Each structure stands twice: as C-alpha cells, then as structure tokens.
Amino acid sequence: ETLLSFISLEDGVFSMVFEFSWCQLELKGPNYFWYDRQEWTPEDLKRELFSSHEMAGDRGWFGVCTENHDQPRSIDHYLPREGRNYYGATMLASMYLLLRGTPYVYQGQEIGMRNCAYASMDDYNDVSTHNQYNRALADGFSPEEALRLVQLESRDNARTPFQWDDTENAGFTTGKPWLKVNPNYTELNAAQEERDEDSVLAWYKKMIGLRLHSQWSELISEGTFAPAYREEKNLIAYRRRFEGKALLVLCNMQPEERE
C-alpha cells in the first residue's frame, strides 16, 4: 500500500522502482547479517514475487531483475546445487524476462556467470564483505566459517571481470584486473556462447526477441499479470493477458522433470 503510493502510474512519485523483497530470502531481517541465515523454499520466492506484482497490478511499474552489483550471481543464489546448469539458468531468465515491468540484464548474467569463491580474504575488495567477515569472527565464527559465508554472499561475486573469451584475464584486459577473474572463464565465456545455438546467451536473445519483436511483444510489455497454479509446489507460474491473447509461463524450480 505504501509502495503503491510511490509507484502509481497515475499519481505516484516515481515512474518505476526496483523491488527487492525477494532478493535476500536466505537472510533474517532486520540486520541481514550474512551469518544469520534461514532456510527458504521456492514457495517463499513465489509468495514475495507474486505479492509485489499483484499489488502493483496495472497501476505501478517495476524494474525487474534477478542480479545486480550488490547481489551474488543468480544461478548460485536461487538454484540448488544440482540445478545450477543450462536448464536452471534459462528457467530463471524466462521467469523474470516475461514479467510485467522493465527487465534489466546485469553484465555477465546473459552468459550465466557464476559466483567466484576466492580462497583468501585478501582477494576481496568490497568493504561490506570485510565488515561482514569481521562481524562473523567477532560473534564466534571461525575464519573458515566466516570465509564460507563471504563466498556465498559477497558483492564481489558479481563484480569480477566480464568473461569475453578464453584468453588471459578472460579477454578483459592485458593489465592487472581489479579482481581476479573467475577461473571458470576458460569454459564459460561470451565467445564460446556466441558459437553455441543452445547456450544461455542464445536463450537470452530468444527471450528478448520474444519480448521486443514478436506477435507476443505487446502482451509481454503491456499485459496484465496473474498467478497460476499457485498451490503447486516448486512451480512458479503466471499468466499474462492482453486484448484477447494469453501467455502461460511455467518455471519448474526443482531439478526433476514434471508434468
């Protein structure tokens, strides 16, 4: 209700805002210390995602994202270990690129870049990361435990150099980068994905093309949002409708196939 007063297309203060209620489900408020963690399920993600979009309806407008410079990489953040692959990455892409709102693609997300678990705190630059590490130590966690929390949550996970190709420093620079390049760059890089019709990058291009240059473009851009199959576990599903057309989006949040 309060948010709507800010984002209403009729009399709100802003024409668009980012809504992050579903971005840190694993951390307990109000402090959101990295060591103060809680279990979450796809049902929690679905609840937060649906409540925001149902509240906004056709009266407000969101900037929609699953990654930014202050969050871990989405594949590692939202998916179980066994789901961190092509299918999981493209499912997450479809989930948010087809929502009502303006989708934002953060650098590297379109090729499925991953968290970079540095082995030493000396490799991390982010001041918040060092603050959280020191707080964990002060509250009784071992250096190994505190480092593991950093590897999961550090903002530097999303700030490593973009992985252009498999040459030195992932083709980003011939100098010394501000952060170490993720060592997976030899297998995961833009040049390789450009050559692969079944890559994560190719899927992003398809979804963006569907949104911008297809018979569904107007529906995806302007259509209404409504949850679907809300009671189904491990499934995030919604319908978009516009002028007699309907689009059903089904996102399977479990590694196993379902019917």
What residue spans do the PLM features occupy?
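Active-site and adjacent substrate-binding regions of carbohydrate-active enzymes
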Residues: 1-259
